[in-house]
């Protein structure tokens, strides 16, 4: 019992005799169903040990886990950085400035005080309305806020609300914010009545005049000035006396000058701003400017005028309402910046009258543009009716510095005229013209430009004999003027348009006549017209000064024409050769006719003008910091900005310039006409003057004397990187040159018809050589025989195609603009 208890492997239920069986076999026998075990042949196999499991945190796994961790960390950091950048740097604010008129609310004087309860309440109401308009629009997720800056009276009644709208959105989506789109949302929200046929509609309960809604893109700097707390140079000036002149003066000699003057007059009157002098840094309004607005906020479409350079000439501007904004900007005052001006309250004027004309072949009265002598405001309108006393008389209108021509499909830049149901365009010029209407009853309507204020117009009127416009013995010019018949074909441009010198029969001059020797236009002109050469003798002998003589610095005059900078000292004081360092030498050795490659260094005054990095126009060096080019290269808001322009000097192959300078300033002639290409000339001032060390590679070309005469058939050269053929898609990489000859002006006028005295033609009538697209603004260089210097005779302007037979190129005649050039570049005198 004890033994059983001591052995736990034994159990009492298993110990039964019946469960035991014994089988006895003999030794040599085999157990049934068993194979004898195999004896091992070799060494006994070692017993297999159980495999140990490797620990998880071994070196290899640690490296893998660490790599995965670093990858996750890098992805997370990059994602966070991307989110941060997208929230900070990639979002831009877009500012819009505008105004509209509320017709059903009367103006309160308290609205002038921005801290008053009345102003704050009205501003809150308008802001809530604007917020509702844009938060329910397609731009809702980008809309940030609206700010009412001013609430003013106006001459049409009600309130004029000036406001800002701000959007914030990713930079990549900024292109969807078109000015027209944002304005359309506001205008479309105004519900107008078709039945009442009125422009006044409901804008969330506000009665808004749809015609008054103006909305333009604005500048962040203007927004900050309008709504910011720092208004150190901002003034609100209210004028309520008709006889007073309110002074407007401010100046600074250093620091910055950023001033806003808000001018408001009593209801029913206008504001006239008169500027006596202004000091600015002339740079095309890039930094310094004085801008006059027909509003109380800087709304681009409400600009009346912009001044970009200093002036001491009295200028005055008139508003179209009882308010005006004047902004003076000069962020980096170097010497002096400021304005001296005054403003006054004036009544509105009606520009209409009926006039009875009595005189024949004389001018008996004057009409003028509105508010003369002020610049007349945009969108003004004048009507005049003229009636003559006789049916045989017509009406003659004499314009000063102005001309009207038939309206073309391009429209009119300076307003349009309707005269007896015929449409005309007006343009400014530097001489007078006469326009005749062959009718005893004349209805005239002037519709002013819708963009900016324009220069004042003064027009004389009178009657004339329809059957004989000019008196007997007179020649009728294309400009409408009448000149004595004796002045026809005398070599002098008496008509101002050269029409008296066209279609002249060339006759051999009467060299022996006293009148020819004393007053002949061919005398002392540098060309030998008489066989014995007497027309070119005694040309520097002192004579009394006239309009046809050359005047020295010591007031001595002589008959020699084109004496300035001709390489010969003619004046006793040497003043005729002062400042004549142009075209001192030339490496011109070989000429290739027909638009072939030039030689490097041949044309050291040639310039390539690049716009946004690409070659666009040509120009000529006339001094160390001034270039001369064509006005049409810079026509339009985008091209007139000097910022994207660079000048490449001393260049033979495109991309290999010896000197490159940004353009600081572009001066386009004030009379440039984009429809006719008249006055197609512009000056460019470099930001950096080219160094004297490059004078062997860069040289100025000589400016011709004022009124220089040229002879047809004279050989000259046109150069540039323009297209070699009209069908080419791009310009030449190598500077091209082509020999051309000056074409007779009569042939030029016969070919094109619209040639003015400020143009000349040059080319080869076969069409073999000509300028083409890309050459515009480049030089037409002619070599003077007397001293071998190169003269800038013309500037590539326009033409009919390129190299077409019988259609020569048209060039700006530089000699017609010498006084204008000297106005900006006096060092050339």
UniProtKB/Swiss-Prot annotation:
Name of the protein this chain belongs to: Transmembrane protease serine 7
Q: Where is this region: Disordered?
A: 26-52
Domain LDL-receptor class A spans what residues? 469-505, 503-540, 544-581
Instruction: Report the gene name.
Output: Tmprss7
For the CUB domain, which residue ranges apply? Answer: 233-346, 351-467
Name the InterPro entries for this protein.
CUB_dom, LDL_receptor-like_sf, LDLR_class-A_CS, LDrepeatLR_classA_rpt, Peptidase_S1_PA, Peptidase_S1_PA_chymotrypsin, Peptidase_S1A, SEA_dom
Question: What residue ranges lie in the Extracellular compartment?
Answer: 84-829
Q: What is the lineage of its organism?
A: Eukaryota, Metazoa, Chordata, Craniata, Vertebrata
Give the transmembrane region(s): 63-83
Pfam families xref list? CUB, Ldl_recept_a, SEA, Trypsin
Q: Where in the cell is it found?
A: Cell membrane
Report the residue ranges that make up the Peptidase S1 domain in this protein: 592-826
**CC annotations in GO:** plasma membrane
């Amino acid at each position: 019992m004890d033994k059983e208890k001591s052995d736990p492997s034994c159990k009492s239920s298993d110990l039964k005799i019946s469960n035991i069986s014994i089988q006895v076999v003999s030794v040599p026998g085999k157990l049934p169903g068993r194979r004898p075990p195999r004896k091992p042949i070799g060494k006994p196999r070692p017993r297999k040990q159980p495999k140990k499991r490797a620990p998880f945190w071994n070196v290899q796994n640690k490296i893998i886990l660490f790599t995965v961790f670093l990858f996750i960390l890098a992805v997370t950091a990059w994602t966070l950085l991307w989110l941060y950048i997208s929230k900070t740097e990639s979002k831009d604010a877009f500012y819009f400035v505008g105004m509209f008129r509320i017709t059903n609310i009367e103006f309160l004087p308290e609205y002038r005080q921005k801290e008053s309860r009345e102003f704050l309440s009205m501003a809150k109401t308008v802001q809530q309305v604007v917020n509702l308009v844009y938060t329910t629009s397609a731009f809702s997720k980008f809309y940030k806020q609206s700010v009412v800056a001013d609430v003013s009276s106006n001459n049409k009644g009600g309130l004029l609300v000036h406001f800002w709208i701000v959007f914030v959105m990713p930079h990549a989506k900024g292109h969807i914010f078109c000015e027209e789109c944002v304005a359309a949302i506001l205008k479309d929200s105004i519900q107008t009545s078709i039945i009442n046929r009125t422009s006044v509609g409901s804008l969330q309960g506000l009665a808004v005049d749809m015609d008054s809604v103006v909305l333009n893109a604005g500048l962040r700097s203007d927004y900050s000035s309008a709504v910011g707390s720092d208004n150190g140079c901002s003034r609100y000036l209210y004028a309520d006396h008709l006889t007073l002149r309110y002074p407007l003066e401010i100046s600074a000699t250093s620091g910055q000058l950023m001033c806003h003057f808000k001018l408001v007059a009593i209801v029913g009157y206008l504001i006239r701003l008169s500027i006596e002098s202004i000091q600015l840094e002339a740079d095309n309004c890039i930094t310094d400017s004085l801008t006059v607005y027909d509003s109380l906020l800087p709304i681009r479409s409400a600009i009346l005028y912009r001044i970009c350079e200093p002036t001491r000439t009295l200028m005055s501007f008139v508003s179209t309402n009882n308010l005006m904004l004047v902004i003076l900007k000069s962020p980096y005052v170097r010497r002096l910046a400021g304005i001296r001006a005054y403003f006054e309250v004036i009544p509105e004027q009606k520009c209409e009258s009926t006039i009875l004309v009595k005189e024949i072949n004389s001018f008996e009265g004057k009409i003028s543009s509105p508010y003369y002598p002020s610049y007349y405001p945009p969108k003004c309108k004048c009507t005049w009716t003229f009636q003559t006393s006789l049916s045989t008389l017509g009406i003659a209108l004499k314009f000063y510095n102005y001309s009207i021509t038939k309206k073309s499909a391009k429209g009119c830049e300076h307003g349009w005229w309707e005269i007896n149901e015929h449409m005309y365009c007006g343009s400014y010029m530097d001489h007078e013209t006469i326009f005749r209407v062959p009718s005893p009853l004349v209805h005239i309507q002037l519709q002013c430009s819708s963009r900016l204020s324009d220069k004042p117009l003064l027009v004389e009127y009178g009657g004339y004999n329809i059957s004989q416009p000019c008196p007997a013995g007179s020649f009728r010019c294309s400009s409408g003027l009448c000149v004595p018949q004796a002045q026809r074909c005398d070599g002098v441009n008496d008509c101002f348009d050269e029409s008296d010198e066209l279609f002249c029969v060339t006759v051999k001059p009467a060299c022996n006549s006293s009148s020819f020797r004393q007053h002949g236009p061919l005398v002392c002109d540098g060309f030998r017209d008489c066989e014995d050469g007497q027309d070119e003798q005694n040309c520097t002998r002192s004579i009394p000064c006239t309009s046809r003589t050359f005047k020295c610095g010591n007031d001595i005059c002589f008959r020699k024409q084109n004496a300035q900078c001709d390489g010969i000292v003619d004046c006793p004081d040497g003043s005729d050769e002062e400042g004549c360092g142009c075209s001192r030498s030339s490496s011109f050795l070989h000429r290739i006719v027909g638009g072939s490659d030039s030689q490097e260094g041949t044309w050291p005054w040639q310039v390539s003008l690049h716009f946004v990095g690409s070659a666009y126009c040509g120009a000529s060096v006339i001094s160390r910091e001034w270039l001369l080019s064509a006005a049409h290269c810079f026509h339009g808001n985008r091209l007139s900005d000097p910022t994207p322009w660079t000048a490449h000097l001393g260049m033979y192959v495109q991309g290999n310039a010896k000197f490159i300078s940004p353009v600081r300033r572009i001066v386009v002639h004030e009379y440039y006409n984009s429809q006719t290409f008249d006055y197609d000339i512009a000056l460019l001032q470099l930001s950096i003057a080219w160094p004297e060390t490059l004078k062997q590679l860069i040289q100025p070309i000589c400016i011709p004397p004022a009124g220089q005469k040229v002879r047809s058939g004279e050989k000259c050269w046109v150069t540039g990187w323009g297209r070699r053929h009209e069908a080419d898609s791009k310009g030449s990489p190598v500077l091209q040159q082509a020999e051309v000859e000056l074409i007779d002006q009569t042939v030029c006028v016969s070919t094109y018809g619209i040639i003015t005295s400020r143009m000349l033609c040059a080319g080869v009538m076969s069409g073999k050589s000509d300028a083409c697209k890309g050459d515009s603004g480049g030089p037409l260089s002619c070599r003077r025989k007397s001293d071998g210097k190169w003269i800038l005779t013309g500037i590539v302007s326009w033409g009919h195609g390129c190299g077409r037979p019988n259609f020569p190129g048209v060039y700006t005649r530089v000699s017609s603009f010498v006084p204008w050039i000297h106005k900006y570049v006096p060092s050339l005198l």
